[in-house]
């Protein structure tokens, strides 16, 4: 007769299933058109991912681009050509429907922002899922660090910089950064906290004067929403997974699909599993 599993094992399994269910529910909401906005602080504890979908003919070059630029493009998963599933990231993922909002690019021009891309799917498309800073924000909040765009209920501000990425094949372009304002002491703590998560951008790439990295006006982000910067705070900048979108605009591949900035794929992976130490 098979003996029942010890209580602690059953409890652990149920906890894992419950946590995975939160990510799965977020994807179902996106798939059903009920989730169409930014995903910051959604399904707490879950890894979120940026998306870039490209034809197989240029997928190898883009893979090398990600490998050469691990700060803005830390790869979490790569699909098989034509396969919209990503079983390593979660139950029943369909990358054509499970992102709240997509961007469609043709010859480097943004032509649409649909809620699903089933009608555009092709057998030669390869999906790249890239780590997102929304994942380390959980650790920031747990350490008592403020995250302004969550406080204000808006999207994180993102900016194109004058920092060049390392090219691979046709892919090259400017680094995009996300910004969170912090007091100096909190910025030091944020460096310590986010350094533990290299697979979701890790430590900041710059803090202080935005002009040094080519940002003229923090009140006019290239992507996302401007946030309040209070007295005594400095802007802190992290490499951002929207970088491929600035590269797409520069390189102009014939076809590409990305997520809309701030509108991520919510996975079943847990943020705690990404901590390097």
Curated annotation (Swiss-Prot):
One family name in Pfam for this protein: D-Glu_cyclase
Gene3D superfamilies: PSTPO5379-like, PSTPO5379-like domain
One annotated GO molecular function: lyase activity
Keywords per UniProt: Lyase
Family designation: Belongs to the D-glutamate cyclase family.
This enzyme's EC code(s): 4.2.1.-
The keyword Lyase is annotated on this UniProt entry: yes
Provenance organism: Bordetella pertussis (strain Tohama I / ATCC BAA-589 / NCTC 13251)
Listed name of the protein: Putative hydro-lyase BP1875
Domain of life according to the entry: Bacteria
Phylogenetic placement of the source organism: Bacteria, Pseudomonadati, Pseudomonadota, Betaproteobacteria, Burkholderiales
């Amino acid at each position: 007769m098979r003996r029942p599993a010890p209580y602690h094992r059953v409890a652990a399994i149920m906890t894992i299933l419950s946590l995975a269910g939160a990510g799965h529910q977020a994807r179902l909401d996106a798939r059903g058109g009920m989730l169409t906005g930014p995903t910051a602080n959604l399904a707490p504890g879950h890894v979120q991912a940026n998306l870039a979908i490209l034809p197989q003919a240029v997928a190898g070059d883009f893979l090398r681009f990600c490998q050469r630029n691990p700060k803005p493009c830390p790869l979490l998963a790569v699909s098989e050509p034509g396969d919209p599933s990503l079983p390593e990231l979660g139950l029943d993922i369909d990358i054509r429907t499970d992102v709240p909002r997509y961007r469609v690019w043709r010859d480097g021009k943004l032509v649409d922002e649909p809620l699903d891309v089933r009608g555009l799917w092709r057998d030669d498309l390869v999906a790249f899922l890239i780590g997102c800073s929304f994942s380390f924000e959980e650790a920031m909040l747990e350490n008592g660090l403020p995250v302004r765009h969550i406080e204000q209920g808006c999207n994180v501000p993102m900016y194109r910089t004058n920092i060049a990425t390392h090219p691979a094949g046709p892919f090259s372009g400017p680094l995009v950064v996300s910004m969170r304002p912090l007091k100096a002491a909190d910025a030091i703590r944020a460096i310590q906290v986010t350094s533990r998560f290299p697979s979701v951008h890790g430590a900041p790439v710059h803090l202080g004067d935005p002009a040094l990295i080519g940002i003229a006006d923090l009140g006019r982000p290239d992507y996302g929403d401007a946030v309040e910067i209070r007295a005594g705070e400095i802007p802190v900048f992290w490499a951002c997974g929207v970088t491929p979108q600035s590269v797409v605009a520069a390189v102009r591949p014939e076809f590409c699909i990305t997520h809309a900035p701030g509108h991520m794929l919510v996975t079943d992976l847990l943020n705690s599993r990404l901590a390097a130490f």
